Amino acid sequence: MIISKLQKQQIAEIKRLPLKKIKMNKGGPIIIIEDDLDDQEILTDIFHELDYKNEIIFFAEGEKALEYLTSTQVEPFIIFSDINMPKLNGMELREKIHQNEDLRLKSIPYLFFSTSAEQKHVVDAYSKSIQGFFVKPTAYKEIKETIRIIVSYWETCVSPNYVK
């Protein structure tokens, strides 16, 4: 490949620019989309015990979560979503978020946290550019440890977040 003198100058200028790490909004709210009230209560207790400073916002329906995400200026830290929900399920919600350029550019990690782990769901989920698929453990202690590991990972991760 032949590089012109102008291209070499442009490359040299780019290399001199400061490298910026763009981080996701780690202080933003944690969105949990879960229609099971018992699971909501368990997750509330776990997040309280883990003492995260992030606001926890629950939605029982995917439609309500989408309304919130498209109408707020707040950039959530992470989204935990169930798959099987009434009206707009987790897969459909993920598709709508991915199709919305403003939401897509916010680079909000979208994770499935569900009891449903059928092969079809896992394949469909990853085809929609999700950032993780976790089978919800049945034991409280295991749920808590899974949440701790997930949040810890995303707290240390750098994301190409949308810069305004």
Annotated model-derived regions:
Residues A125-Q131:
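As written
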Residues L37-F59:
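Two-component/phosphorelay signaling modules centered on CheY-like receiver
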Residues M85:
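Receiver (REC) domain active-site loop signature in two-component systems and cognate sites
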